[in-house]
Swiss-Prot record:
Family: Belongs to the KdpA family.
Subcellular location per the Swiss-Prot or TrEMBL entry: Cell membrane
Pfam families the record matches: KdpA
Membrane-protein topology: Multi-pass membrane protein
Protein known as: Potassium-transporting ATPase potassium-binding subunit
An example Gene Ontology CC term for this record: plasma membrane
Keyword Membrane belongs to the record: yes
Spans through the membrane: 11-31, 63-83, 134-154, 179-199, 254-274, 282-302, 329-349, 356-376, 379-399, 417-437, 488-508, 530-550
Function according to Swiss-Prot or TrEMBL: Part of the high-affinity ATP-driven potassium transport (or Kdp) system, which catalyzes the hydrolysis of ATP coupled with the electrogenic transport of potassium into the cytoplasm. This subunit binds the extracellular potassium ions and delivers the ions to the membrane domain of KdpB through an intramembrane tunnel.
Lineage start: Bacteria, Bacillati, Bacillota, Bacilli, Bacillales
Quaternary data: The system is composed of three essential subunits: KdpA, KdpB and KdpC.
Keywords assigned: Cell membrane, Ion transport, Membrane, Potassium, Potassium transport, Transmembrane, Transmembrane helix, Transport
GO molecular function, one term: potassium ion binding
InterPro entries: KdpA
Length: 560
């Protein structure tokens, strides 16, 4: 137990050591003129000149939102065309065929929404050109889109006016100043530890038995870096980060975990710098971290305890539940990876979630249902800010004061927009899950009938709604029904909340901040952190508790 505690503590300390200065860097990159402008501004100026972008033109929230949707729609259309003709394009040494229309729709929506749900196997479903031009490109642009939304919200809370910035400038800066430099660093580290980086699509090797085997290769390291830094999650190979070419070593495992965790963990500190009150950032970070550690403890204990039926059958169960796990990672690092990838809504996996114990599988489900414990790049911060505003609103009602957040009144207009985003999340999980469980098109995909089958279906839609992308991969989901239904859920889960929170940002930026008084409810204290924790926990529990009882909890009770 001590070695597990020491491993986790070291990784947590590394996270804080990375996240705090990274938060300051993000603040300088987006909000402040500094020394980095001398290096990056000339590069950005070339991009602005070639694309005709007027980067200094401020936008209202409507203009900002329109620009975001247009850019995303254009990228989606280009990507759809690429996958439909990939067979005829170069860098296709494996002769990969064109994608079927509904699978193409699901795939391009998945990567555009930062979900990376994969109803295909990476090494056989995409050519190297598609992996580079489509997958890697989308991983940058979808992560940058999320960062722009967080940037716009932070800007709205830290200034007074009618505008929230320039989308194109924020989008370019997110790529040039943040994602590209970090990706280069992580790529070099991964290559150093043995992750392949080559244009060779296939390689024939001799096996230990004297036979030959063809191995799939490609530019894996460069994809892996942005896959995790951008909280994307889509794997170059079907086995994702369980594959030895994606994640060959415990060191690469730690690098990948910290990569997908660092930007979501840094954004609260960026927010603290922007509002000139670093305590604000620490309160948000601490609240999310406590929620995360609680969930991690549950999944680790569940997996270490193993399946009770194994012990009852006379077999040794002291090694815990190693089904679906890599021996090189073991239960501790597999459990931590599971918690991080669903907390940060990345979706990459170093073990098979379908093989988790019932309670172990409940944890990634719960983290995606909450969708605000760090969350994805940008959007996770927006989600926790949404809950922070709800907490302030409820606290204000209880003491009979007009709720205020950073001196700005939270009024019915903002709450209506927040509630739309809040209620949509469970709706697009529970409604399609019910439809799938009531129809043959849905139930025919279930590989484990019974309570686990319910969990498989609910997990698929929860992962889609939270823009996570992981799955209980026993589900046979490459059908028209699953491709279209999850595609629609991914679109709604991504863009409705983005539009709603940009509207909230547009409303708040125009309000005159109210001076702080002795009666002001402060949001930079431990008291507010406790209230925020309770708000997240209670709303999540009340919303999803019934379906969790029907799935993982009921399954657990059957094997006790």
């Amino acid at each position: 137990m001590w070695h597990v505690f020491s491993q986790y503590t070291l990784i947590f300390l590394l996270l804080i050591v990375i996240a705090v200065p990274l938060g300051k860097y993000l603040y300088v990159a987006f909000f402040e003129k500094g020394k980095i402008d001398r290096f990056f501004s000339p590069i950005e100026a070339v991009i602005y000149r070639l694309s005709g972008i007027r980067s200094l033109e401020e936008m209202t929230w409507k203009s900002y939102c329109t620009a975001l949707l247009i850019v995303n729609a254009a990228l989606l259309g280009i990507s759809y065309g690429l996958l439909r003709i990939q067979h005829y394009l170069p860098l296709n040494g494996a002769k990969v065929e064109n994608m079927e229309p509904t699978l193409t729709f699901n795939t391009v929506v998945s990567f555009m929404t930062n979900t990376n749900l994969q109803h295909y196997s990476g090494e056989s479903g995409l050519s190297i050109l598609s992996q580079m031009l489509f997958v890697t490109m989308m991983m940058f642009t979808s992560a940058a889109t999320g960062l722009t939304v967080a940037t716009a919200l932070i800007r709205a809370l830290s200034k007074k006016g009618k505008t929230i910035g320039n989308f194109y400038q924020d989008f370019v800066r997110a790529n040039v100043r943040v994602l590209l430099p970090l990706s280069v660093i992580v790529t070099i580290l991964l290559v150093a530890f043995g992750v392949p980086q080559t244009f060779l699509a296939r390689m024939a090797v001799s096996t230990l038995e004297g036979g030959t085997q063809t191995l799939a290769l490609g530019p894996v390291a460069s994809l892996e870096s942005i896959k995790h830094l951008g909280t994307n999650g889509g794997g170059f190979f079907g086995a994702n980060s369980s594959h030895p070419f994606e994640n060959p070593h415990p060191f690469t495992n730690v690098i990948e975990m910290l990569s997908m965790w660092c930007i979501p963990a840094a954004l609260p500190f960026t927010y603290g710098h922007a509002v000139k009150n670093r305590k604000q950032g620490w309160v948000l970070f601490a609240t999310m971290f406590v929620l995360f550690v609680m969930m991690l403890g549950v999944v680790y204990n569940a997996e270490q305890s193993g399946n009770p039926l194994v012990g009852k059958s006379g077999f040794a169960a002291d090694q815990g539940n190693m089904e679906g796990k890599e021996v090189r990672f073991g239960i501790p690092l597999s459990s931590l990876f599971t918690a991080i990838t669903t907390a940060a809504t990345t979706g990459s996996v170093n073990n098979m979630h379908d093989s988790l114990t019932p309670i172990g599988g409940l944890v990634p489900l719960a983290l995606m249902m909450l969708n605000n414990v760090f969350g994805g790049d940008g959007v996770g911060f927006v989600n926790i800010m949404m809950y922070a505003m709800i907490a302030v609103f409820l606290s204000g009602l209880m003491v009979g004061r007009t709720p205020e957040f950073l001196g700005r009144k939270i009024e019915p207009k903002e709450m209506k927009l927040i509630v739309i985003a809040l209620l949509l999340h469970p709706l697009i999980i529970l409604a399609p899950s019910a439809i799938a469980l009531m129809t043959h098109m849905g139930t025919e995909a279930i590989s484990n009938p019974g309570f686990h089958g319910i969990s498989q279906v609910v997990y698929e839609y929860t992962s889609s709604a939270a823009n996570n992308g992981s799955g209980f991969e026993g589900l046979k989901d490459n059908t028209a029904f699953w491709n279209i239904s999850t595609g629609v859920v991914m679109l709604l889960g991504r863009y409705v909340s983005i539009i709603a929170m940009l509207a909230v940002a547009g409303s708040l930026v125009g309000k005159q901040p109210v001076p702080e008084t002795i009666g002001t409810f402060r949001t930079d204290t431990a008291t507010f952190g406790v209230i925020l924790f309770g708000t997240v926990f209670i709303i999540g529990a009340l919303t999803f508790f019934p379906v969790l009882i029907l799935g993982p909890v009921a399954e657990y009770l059957t094997i006790r």
